[in-house]
Amino acid sequence: MNLQDHFLIAMPHLEDENFQRSVVYICENNEQGSMGLVLTQATDLSIAELCAKMNFMMADEREYSDKLVLLGGPVNLEHGFILHKKTAQEFQHSYKVTDQIYLTTSADIINTFGTAQSPEKYLVTLGCARWEPNQLENEIANNDWLVVPADEDILFDVDISERWFAANQLLGIEHVNFSYQQQMEHS
C-alpha cells in the first residue's frame, strides 16, 4: 500500500513526545523510505513572525497569516516545509504530492505570502518526520499508527488542537473508545 497522501494517526499508547496524539501527513512513501509532516504540534511562532524574521516583510503593506508555524517533526528542524494547494506559479523546489497538493522547500514561495500569487491554502512547518525503508510499515504492523486517506479540510482548515480527533472520526472512531480500551488493557 502506498501511504503517500494518507494520514497516520498515532495510537494512544504511542508515547514518543514527537508523535504522541499526532496526525502525520505522508508526503512521500517509496522504496527509499517515507517522509511526512506532523500536523498537530504548533510552535509559538506565527507565519507573520517567521516572515519578519526572514526579512520577507515588504513595504507594500502585505497581510500575513497569523496562523502558527507547526513543528513538522524531529528531523531537519532548521528547514522550512510549506504544504500547499496547487498554484499557477511554479516554485524552485516543489514536490507534487497529489494533483492538488504540493510540498515546497524553497523560500520563493514565502515571497508570495500576502499577495495574489500566494497559495489559496497552505501550512508552514519547521522540521519533518522521516522513516527508513520499511520502518513505517513495521510501525503500522505493530499498531503504533492507524492509516486513513488524507482529508483536505483536516489538513488546512481544522484547528490544530482538533486534528487528532477529526482524523479519528474519518475512521468512525471516537476518542472515548480509545480511553476505554486503554483502561481495559491496563486492568
UniProtKB/Swiss-Prot annotation:
Listed InterPro entries: AlgH-like
Signal peptide: none
Residue pairs linked by disulfide bridges in the UniProt entry: none
Gene Ontology, cellular component aspect: cytosol
NCBIfam families tied to this protein: PRK00228.1-1
Family label: Belongs to the UPF0301 (AlgH) family.
Name by which UniProt lists this protein: UPF0301 protein HS_0009
